[in-house]
């Protein structure tokens, strides 16, 4: 995890904030700063000027359509100017939040395909990176999530928010599906709880009663008899993922920590039900 590198004083422990538009989600940016603050790491704000926009502007038939339905010719110079102003504005916004949280910040601007730019940034200074997506991920864009995990190798986790995100303060909800993920999630949750406030709550997620009983035994054995941590059980055969998101909402969750490729977020990246109800950031570990 990123915390091991950050605590050792190495420069590679960082949060890479992926900025690709002029309308990032405020909760996503705040969450990225909070993760860096919790793990004593730095932030690299990576603003990507989408190369496809420049290619499009090179065509003589390219037009920009305003909200009032007016059109005008789209030139490469116009795109370059707007991108530069947008990037400067976003970098100042991130800088203000990072300074207030006493988090070191590096700013970088590249012109590339957004996913490839992220992959290159993490490969150049990795592998202990947490990627934070500044744009809210729409529920129907789960395939993009799978693409990121498959393409961007130099990461230990990915933070994202959905369109309903509204807070980062509150309980840290660790959704545990296997004993192997317990300790990394627990350490991450405890670090984040000290910064964000609230308690760490473990939700044991399974798909059958037998799996639930086995996981419960393994988790309690690992925690020890003296642990006072709040433990909850949830079986996916009971209802849809949206109902689990409702449980998290009622717990006043400020962050959810989960595992990519499991029951919470399947490998196909289907987030439709979960993101229609989730009101806090989702921190996915590999």
Language-model features: locations:
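Small/aliphatic-rich secondary-structure junction motif
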Residues: 2-73, 170-234, 242, 253, ...
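Short glycine/proline- and acidic residue-enriched helix-loop micro-motifs
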Residues: 71-81
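A short helix-to-beta-strand connector/capping loop
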Residues: 98-106, 224-231
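Charged docking surfaces used in two-component/phosphorelay signaling
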Residues: 109-117, 237-241
